[in-house]
Amino acid sequence: MYKRQLIYIRRPDKKNAGFFQLILFRIADSVITGMCVTIVTLPVILIISGQIPVISLFLNVIVIPLMSLIMISGIFTGIAGMLSLEAAYFFAGAGGYILDFYYKLCSLSSHFKYAVIVTGTPDTARVFLYFTVLIIWICVHVILMNKKIDAVCFALLVCVLTGLHYNIDSDMKIAMLDVGQGDSIVMHTKEGMNVLFDGGSTSKKNVGRYTIYTYLKYCGVRSLDYVFISHPDKDHVNGIYELIELCDNTFEIGTVVLPGIRRTTAVKKQAGDDMSKLERTLKATGINVVYADAGDSIKSGEFSVECMHPCKGYNYESANDYSAVYLVEYGDFSMLMTGDAEKKAEKCIVEDANRMAGDAGESARFMSVNILKVGHHGSKGASSEEFLSYVKPENALISCGAGNSYGHPHTETLQRLSGIGAKVYRTDESGEIAVRVRDGSYKIEAFKALKG
């Protein structure tokens, strides 16, 4: 038997064992070594990448036996390099070919459906518990050498491992990501629905890959059920293109919702090229696309999203004025997503909301929302007094880049928000802004401490 090893396995008698039997036990050695390495390093891998490389257990059968050749190649390369570069190149060749083989092997294996499982990043307490149980297991094994106790400890370790990425959360979570001069808001419902509102930036490069996608992996998000795009400006969609490119076996997008302006002349005049490019990209990837007009909605449990704008048949002079505006409700909680809508769109929203309420025999819509996502990054032309007095937000979230050249948010906009008593949170000052909603109450937290 292997002694003082985490897994018991009978060693063959080399004198009596056949060639194929020795090969099988060599493979078993590689698998066991790979499992031991994975068991020890898995929490670290989860913290760094938020995913489990399942395929690595199988790749180690090939990788580990060849590591000795790479070591030998490296040693001889170092020695030869002191004498002759040509000789060093010769000895480095063997190791280089093996490393190239590793790279191609990993690239090929990444296309398998369950090669990698996205789990999210575990919290510190659970990682500490995992390592505590692991150390206890090793100590018990080394001291007692008892299979039954080993089995109990291993079963406990598996339970803790499962708990590293399994979350039972009764909260709805909202995150306004710090994407610089742009917009991106992610919502997670307790029922497991994941929704993205816009995703772009003109001040951060590769914001889709390195900010939005990284955040989604951190949270263990493997799919976005809905992606709502307010309008096709770069600071709202360039990260979406990157997310589309990242769709593979570990990440997918269900439905993309676009503003219902495809039937208006504004498409040709204002954003025809941008909208057409976006539609072509989505069509090529097979992602489901729907168009939202005022009055359209989706609902899942307590969570609902209703389109308040664009109004049907309206002529738009500015691309920002046809930004899709959505009222998000979760129980008694409400949040208004305004994209880059400005005064003209705001007036249309108020008039249309009152008209729909009157037709239904109801009072005015979304009076006093809990949170307003301030339109157009807090520009002077957005958040008019009429609109704010109608919406009456308790809190206002502004997404803008630090020191941006547009002067966002504008002083007059901040004064108007202050005048109605709304507490303002800004990503240029606070970084990421998180909202937790539970049983009608909510709490807003900033990633960085607010000034003052």
Predicted regions and their residues:
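Hydrophobic/aromatic-rich transmembrane helices and adjacent perimembrane loops
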Residues: 63-66, 71, 98
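Non-globular, low-confidence helical/coil segments that flank catalytic cores
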Residues: 7-15, 22-24, 60, 79-452
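Conserved small/polar residues in nucleotide/adenosyl-binding loops
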Residues: 1-5
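Globin-like tetrapyrrole-binding proteins
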Residues: 41
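Non-cytosolic membrane-interface motifs at loop->transmembrane helix junctions
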Residues: 53-64, 89
